[in-house]
Structures are given as C-alpha cells and as structure tokens.
C-alpha cells in the first residue's frame, strides 16, 4: 500500500493490532511536524468533562457532544482548540487560526470567542497531546502501528455516536476497510 507523508492536517490511524493501549483505535490529527518534533491530538477519545466546566466562554462554538476530548498523555492541563471554518473564510490572513488542511484549523485560544464565531462551523477542545521524538513516528509507521491519511472536516466535529476510527478505516484502500468493524477486544468478536 502506498504511504502518505506525515504533515499537519494528516491523520495517524492506529492499526487494528496496535500494542499500545494508550492509542488503541485512536485517530491522531497532526498539528505540527518538523525535523525536531511531531505532535498532534487524539480526536477519538472523549472524556466525561463538559467544555462548560473548563472553557465556558467557548461552549457556544463547541460541536456536540460538548465534551472535552483527551488529546494525549502529555500536558493534560494544556488545552488545544481545533476548528472547522465555514467555506470561504480567509484562513491565511487570520491571526486566530493556523491552517492544518483545507478548512481545518488550530485555533489560538487567546482570541476572544466572539472574534472567531462568524468564521467557524464548529470546534473541539483537547486536553493534552501526543508527541514523537525525531525518527520515532517514522519507526512506528514502518512497524505498521500507524496508517497516514488526510483528515476531513467531519472527522473533527463528528457527532458523539460516530465511530471515527471505523469511518476513517472505511475510507482507505483495501484491505483496511475490512478492519473497520474490528472490536477493541477481539474476544468480543
């Protein structure tokens, strides 16, 4: 299978047999990729914490379910905001957005919510992030732990009932769609 390159706005899709329990059935959106580091947030791990309890000023822009997501094991006291802009928004000239891909943006949470409200279709908030040292992610991809694929805006603001991992797997070339219903515990099969 052809391998996509890691870049901001790309997804890391955990292989069905990934050994790490921290990233089992995970989808990580890459926010930064450079020779020094790669970091992103797990967009598929919702917590029981309401955004209203942590960032009440951002609730109106938060897509349902309005829960804080667990972005990764590092710096869980830090919150990352991701958004999907409305069609036609000039992302390149915005001081509040860092473009990741098409309409996907990393939102500067120092901005006032009312300053970005007209530009956003929806947002998600993530406590913590995942980070890889130089060469570490490439090694994990070569071992078959991750597949790399482009993100869609719907991946970020998907309703709570959506199995994001399964949906992303179904979009891939064969044989990956065959694993889209792979249970987190194979003994459940």
UniProtKB/Swiss-Prot annotation:
GO cellular component: cytosol
InterPro entries: AlgH-like (IPR003774)
Signal peptide start and end residues: none
Pfam family, one: DUF179
Disulfide bonds listed in the record: none
Similarity field: Belongs to the UPF0301 (AlgH) family.
Protein name: UPF0301 protein Cgl3084/cg3414
Organism: Corynebacterium glutamicum (strain ATCC 13032 / DSM 20300 / JCM 1318 / BCRC 11384 / CCUG 27702 / LMG 3730 / NBRC 12168 / NCIMB 10025 / NRRL B-2784 / 534)
């Amino acid at each position: 299978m052809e391998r996509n390159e890691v870049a901001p706005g790309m997804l890391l899709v955990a292989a069905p047999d990934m050994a790490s329990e921290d990233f089992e059935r995970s989808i990580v959106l890459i926010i930064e990729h450079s020779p020094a580091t790669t970091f992103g947030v797990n967009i598929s791990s919702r917590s029981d914490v309401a955004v209203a309890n942590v960032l009440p000023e951002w609730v109106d822009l938060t897509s349902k379910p309005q829960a804080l997501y667990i972005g990764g094991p590092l710096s869980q006291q830090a919150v990352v905001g991701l958004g999907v802009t409305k069609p036609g928004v000039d992302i390149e000239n915005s001081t509040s957005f860092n473009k990741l891909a098409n309409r996907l943006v990393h939102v500067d949470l120092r901005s006032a919510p009312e300053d970005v409200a007209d530009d956003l279709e929806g947002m998600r908030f993530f406590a913590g992030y995942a980070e890889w040292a130089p060469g570490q992610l490439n090694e994990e991809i070569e071992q078959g732990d991750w597949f790399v694929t482009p993100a869609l805006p719907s991946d970020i603001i998907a309703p709570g009932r959506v199995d994001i991992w399964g949906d992303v797997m179904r979009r891939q070339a064969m044989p990956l769609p065959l694993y889209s219903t792979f249970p987190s515990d194979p003994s459940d099969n």
